[in-house]
Amino acid sequence: TQAGLVVDTCILKEADDKMLNTYTVIAVNPEAPFVDADGNSVADVAVNTAGADALIQWFLTQETLDLAANYGFQEYGEYLFYVKDGAPVYTGEIAPATEETKVIRLSTTTSVKDSGLLGYLLPIFESTYGYTVEVQSAGTGKAISAAKFGNADLILVHAKSQEEAFVEEGFARTVDGFEAERISFLYNYFVLCGPSADPAGVKEAASVLDAFAAIAEGEYPFISRGDGSGTHTKELSLWPEALGI
């Protein structure tokens, strides 16, 4: 129950491409214009580029992609992540940890962390290559801000517009074996949840855009993340343009 609204069922799932939720990994540029929380420039930020490269390269091996794609099915009977069509596959060497590179700081989203995917994958990476991955999670906006503050070596997030801004502002770099700064490789779907009574008739909506329009036109309550996260960014893109949200 949220704000007097009983949310007890998923009423729209995987309806169309607008519900796609794509995950992207980006390496942090050690020469980026780092700032503090007040926007002041920060110098002498140490970024573990070698460790970030190793983790990103490992994420994109066929073996790891297969592990991610199959994660969740045995426990939940459903796949929680899918490999994105056209995702690059890394086939080169992956450098093991050294004393200087063994700690990797990963800033990611709550959806990735809470899914349990990293808890499943990272111990395999750590035991194989000798690294220790320190994971901090928040909404995408805050996860990206952590990198801008110099507190991450790489980010794993899911909001294209914010990712592109991160790249354009000079915070990203390419990784050996890849052509682009943004490496999108996994996806799943957002779902629309609400009361089983479904007063807005969302279940009958032809698309998620129609569903949001019905909610807006009927002035039904809607619970928003409202936090600049990837989920919030997606939500804002789905409301009718006429509302000016």
Regions found by a protein language model. Give the residues of each.
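Exported/periplasmic ABC-transporter solute-binding proteins
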Residues: 1-132, 141, 145, 151, ...
